[in-house]
Amino acid sequence: MVKKVDGVQFENEARKSATALVDFSATWCGPCRMLAPVLEDLSEKMAGKLDFYNVDVDEVPELAQEFGVSSIPCLVLMKNGKPVSQSVGFRPGDQLKAWIEGNI
């Protein structure tokens, strides 16, 4: 499951997660809407390996700014609260899975 989080939840959950994938997106973004079901599927297939979160850049712009998000969708892979890799734009599930596994 991909959990939508606000700023407080991000600090309390995503930043404290051992390994997390954060999806920075917006409701009006077409590629973001295409990516959402891909991430849901991956979150089920990779359950127990990492936590999946979604941040709406319009609702929490300060987080987007902190992570240098200038284009969406933007995926940030985090380990122990620190970003380790970033992917911008839509990618099919198999490519995303390979990217994640290559960075965790």
Language-model features and meaning:
Residues D58:
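Adenine-nucleotide cofactor-binding loop residues
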Residues F24-V38:
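Conserved redox-active cysteine motifs that mediate thiol-disulfide chemistry
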Residues K79-I104:
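Non-catalytic, surface beta->alpha helical segment in thiol-disulfide oxidoreductase systems
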Residues A20, P61, F67-V76:
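Structural micro-motif
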